Amino acid sequence: MGIIEEKALFVTCGATVPFPKLVSCVLSDEFCQELIQYGFVRLIIQFGRNYSSEFEHLVQERGGQRESQKIPIDQFGCGDTARQYVLMNGKLKVIGFDFSTKMQSIIRDYSDLVISHAGTGSILDSLRLNKPLIVCVNDSLMDNHQQQIADKFVELGYVWSCAPTETGLIAGLRASQTEKLKPFPVSHNPSFERLLVETIYS
């Protein structure tokens, strides 16, 4: 498979609770090889609060090397928490930070594909910006609302969904490169909002 264009994947774990399984899977050799095969050259990871040292350790475990090149911190809205690395013998740049005040800008301007935890706000951010989205459910959380929400969006044809495993994420990535999702209705949609509320509280 030839590389047609240089693409970026944005992974968001949410603002509060870290999602170590998701971060570990997207940094695995198998997943990164698949990314490169599909023409991705940049992996941007928003990993959540109080996870910086674990993230750095994980990247270094996978052979990542710190890069001194200046990151567009102003555009990313992440203060001085951002770190940049190279993986896979320099074929993949990895940018990681804990939190951003400009998530929608990152999704709109720096992402060709988004992998998100199953928080409703994060899902809607990507869909409203017309970005293809893979939803990864955090199965370590106490309730199953995330699973219900993800299932409903999948049923409606707006997203792909996967478990936080290498196999699941690779399957989601492959689907995103070969299938098309239904366009999300960006205008105010009371019936959809009611459906979402019913799903969350059912």
From Swiss-Prot:
UniProt key word Membrane: no
Pfam families (UniProt xref): Glyco_tran_28_C (PF04101)
Name used for this protein in its record: UDP-N-acetylglucosamine transferase subunit ALG13
One GO cellular component, as annotated: UDP-N-acetylglucosamine transferase complex
Coiled coil spans: none
Function: Involved in protein N-glycosylation. Essential for the second step of the dolichol-linked oligosaccharide pathway.
Domain of life of the native organism: Eukaryota
EC id: 2.4.1.141
Note: Present with 1950 molecules/cell in log phase SD medium.
Enzyme class, spelled out: transferase
Record note on quaternary structure: Heterodimer with ALG14 to form a functional enzyme.
Reaction catalyzed: an N-acetyl-alpha-D-glucosaminyl-diphospho-di-trans,poly-cis-dolichol + UDP-N-acetyl-alpha-D-glucosamine = an N,N'-diacetylchitobiosyl-diphospho-di-trans,poly-cis-dolichol + UDP + H(+)
